[in-house]
Regions:
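Loop/turn-to-beta-strand initiation segments
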Residues: 53, 85, 113-116, 174-181
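Pre-Walker A adenine-sensing motif
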Residues: 6-18
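Conserved P-loop
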Residues: 30-95
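Phosphate-binding/switch region of NTP-binding enzymes
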Residues: 172, 176-241
Length: 254
C-alpha cells in the first residue's frame, strides 16, 4: 500500500512517509490546536505539490473565509479552484436535511477526480440532526412509518454513531485518502467527542495543548492501520508559511 504525503515535512516523517493510500484518518484536538489548518494543508499541498485534486468540506467556515485564511500563508486557493485541483464546500448544519451533503461531497469529488477529501468537523455534523432524520438517512422506512405513530427513542450517542458510520462508509466508497476532524474531550480516555470515531477510522492523530505552555501544542500519532509510524511526541507551531511539526525534546512529559 502506497503512502500519501500530507505535505508537512515533520508530520510526514512522523507518519513514515505519509498516510496509507485510501485510509481515513481522524485529527482530534481541542479548539485552537490546528486541526483545520492541518486539514487545509493536506488539501493545499496535495494540489500544489503533488497535483492531486482535493475537496475541503467545512461546517464552520465558508469558502470565502477559507480563501482569506489561506492568504495568510501565501496560498492561492482560487488559482487551484480554477485549475480544477480544488473544491471548497460549506455545510450549513442548520439547513441540511437527510444528510444530503454526502451526495454533494461525492459529486464534487467525481467532478475533479479528487484523490483527497477533508471533512471539518465531525463534531458539528453529529450535533445538529434529529433522531428521525438519522432514521430516514439510513433508509429506515419502517421506522419512519412507526415514528409517525409512536416516537422512536434514540439517544444522542446513538444519533452520533449513526451519523459517523454513514459518513465514514461514504468516504471509504470514494477511494480517496481522507482526513476528518473532531473535538477532543478535555478529560477521559476517549479520542473524540462522539466516542466512536476512533474505532472506525484507520488512524488517529491527537492534538493537545502543552500543559506547561499555552502556545504549544502536542501532536501524537496514536494509531495508523496498515503502516508503521513514530511513537514519539511532536510539537506543532504555526508560522507565516503554515504548520511546522518537530519532534519534542526528550524527557518532556505529556
Amino acid at each position: 500500500m502506497g503512502r500519501v504525503p500530507i505535505g508537512i515535512e515533520g508530520l510526514d516523517k512522523a507518519l513514515h512517509g505519509g498516510i496509507p493510500e485510501g485510509n481515513v484518518i481522524l485529527i482530534s484536538g481541542s479548539a485552537g490546536t490546528g486541526k483545520t489548518l492541518i486539514g487545509l494543508s493536506f488539501i493545499y499541498y496535495g494540489a500544489s505539490k503533488f497535483n492531486e485534486p482535493g475537496v475541503f468540506v467545512s461546517t464552520d467556515q465558508t469558502p470565502e473565509e477559507l480563501r482569506e485564511e489561506a492568504k495568510n500563508f501565501g496560498w492561492d486557493l482560487e488559482e487551484l479552484e480554477k485549475k480544477n485541483l480544488l473544491r471548497l464546500h460549506h455545510i450549513d448544519v442548520t439547513q441540511e436535511k437527510d444528510m444530503v451533503y454526502l451526495t454533494k461531497i461525492n459529486d464534487l469529488a467525481k467532478e475533479i477526480n479528487a484523490k483527497r477529501i477533508v471533512i471539518d468537523s465531525l463534531t458539528t455534523l453529529t450535533e445538529f440532526l434529529s433522531p428521525m432524520e438519522i432514521v430516514e438517512a439510513r433508509g429506515g422506512k419502517l421506522f419512519e412509518t412507526l415514528g409517525s405513530i409512536v416516537p422512536v427513542p434514540m439517544s444522542e450517542t446513538m444519533i452520533a454513531k449513526s451519523v459517523i458510520i454513514k459518513i465514514l462508509k461514504k468516504l471509504k466508497q470514494t477511494d480517496c485518502t481522507c482526513l476528518v476532524t473532531s473535538e477532543l474531550p478535555e478529560s477521559g480516555e476517549w479520542l473524540s467527542r462522539d466516542t466512536v470515531s476512533e474505532f472506525l477510522v484507520d488512524g488517529v492523530i491527537t492534538l493537545r495543548p502543552f500543559k506547561y505552555a499555552r502556545s504549544d501544542v502536542d501532536l501524537l500519532v496514536v494509531k495508523l492501520r496498515y503502516g508503521d509510524h513514530s511513537k514519539d511526541l511532536h510539537k506543532i507551531s504555526i508560522t507565516d508559511k503554515g504548520v511546522e511539526v518537530k519532534p519534542a525534546e526528550k524527557g518532556v512529559v505529556i
